[in-house]
């Protein structure tokens, strides 16, 4: 399983359970979470990322469409944006989520 696939699986588990700790284990201590297209973040550091997900959790699971694009499970045939992960030493150092409107 790729790091990206593992991240998405753990993200989706967090959506279902509210427990984000398995997903957070994949992040470096200084990981940055950045959203583009919505007025949220950025969040710097694993603790800040964890608090962001705990205080404002997503309400739907991710579905990977290809190497970069994702959809929400509720509308799995409609691309919702792009997910970019930067890896360092086998862990995620940066998460960049692009929200886009596709026609």
Role assignments for model-derived ranges:
Residues 1-103:
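C-terminal and inter-domain tail/linker signature
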């Amino acid at each position: 399983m790729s790091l990206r696939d593992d991240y998405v699986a753990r993200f989706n588990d967090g959506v279902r359970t509210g427990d984000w700790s398995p997903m957070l284990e994949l992040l470096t201590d200084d990981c940055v979470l950045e959203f583009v297209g919505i007025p949220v973040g950025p969040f710097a550091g694993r603790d800040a990322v964890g608090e962001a997900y705990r205080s404002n959790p997503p309400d739907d699971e991710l579905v990977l469409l290809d190497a970069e694009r994702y959809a929400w499970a509720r509308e799995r045939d409609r691309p919702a944006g792009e997910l970019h992960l930067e890896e360092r030493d086998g862990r995620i150092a940066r998460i960049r989520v692009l929200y886009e409107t596709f026609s």
